[in-house]
From Swiss-Prot:
CDD domains: KOW_RPL26 (cd06089). It comes from Spiroplasma kunkelii. The lineage of its organism: Bacteria, Bacillati, Mycoplasmatota, Mollicutes, Entomoplasmatales. Part of the 50S ribosomal subunit. InterPro entries: KOW, Rib_uL2_dom2, Ribosomal_uL24, Ribosomal_uL24_CS, Ribosomal_uL24_KOW, Translation_prot_SH3-like_sf. This is Large ribosomal subunit protein uL24. GO terms for biological process: translation. One of two assembly initiator proteins, it binds directly to the 5'-end of the 23S rRNA, where it nucleates assembly of the 50S subunit. One of the proteins that surrounds the polypeptide exit tunnel on the outside of the subunit. SMART domains: KOW. GO terms for molecular function: rRNA binding; structural constituent of ribosome. Belongs to the universal ribosomal protein uL24 family. One of its GO terms (cellular component) is ribosome. Pfam families: KOW, ribosomal_L24. Keywords: Ribonucleoprotein, Ribosomal protein, RNA-binding, rRNA-binding.
């Protein structure tokens, strides 16, 4: 299992798969499955009519993307993607930073 370095609210870009090129913030991180849910990426699901839902129809469900298909967008230069690294701050706490711009991440 990979270590998930992404957090809710990080601005990411999909770099592979069906939704390649899509950008958006992370809504939810599924650590046990190494997946993230990104705003704006949905799967369309056909729902058959049932007693509870007599209409049925098409429903949009949020889709998750594997973390290997996602890259962080650099907070300083919004057009570049970067990796996440860690650094020990002056107060002794471990802080996430963007590797390219050395900017601190929330």
């Amino acid at each position: 299992m990979n270590k998930v370095k992404f957090k809710k609210g990080d601005l990411v870009k999909v770099i592979a798969g069906k939704h390649k090129g899509t950008e958006g913030p992370i809504i939810r991180v599924l650590r046990e499955k190494s997946r993230v849910v990104i705003e704006g990426i949905t799967n369309i699901k056909h729902v058959k009519p049932s007693q509870d839902n007599t209409e049925g129809g098409i429903q949009q469900v949020p889709a998750s993307v594997h973390i290997s298909n996602v890259a962080l967008i650099d907070p300083k230069n919004k057009k570049e993607i970067t990796k996440i690294s860690y650094q020990i701050a002056d107060n002794g706490k471990k802080v996430r930073i963007a590797r390219k711009s050395k900017a601190h991440l929330a």
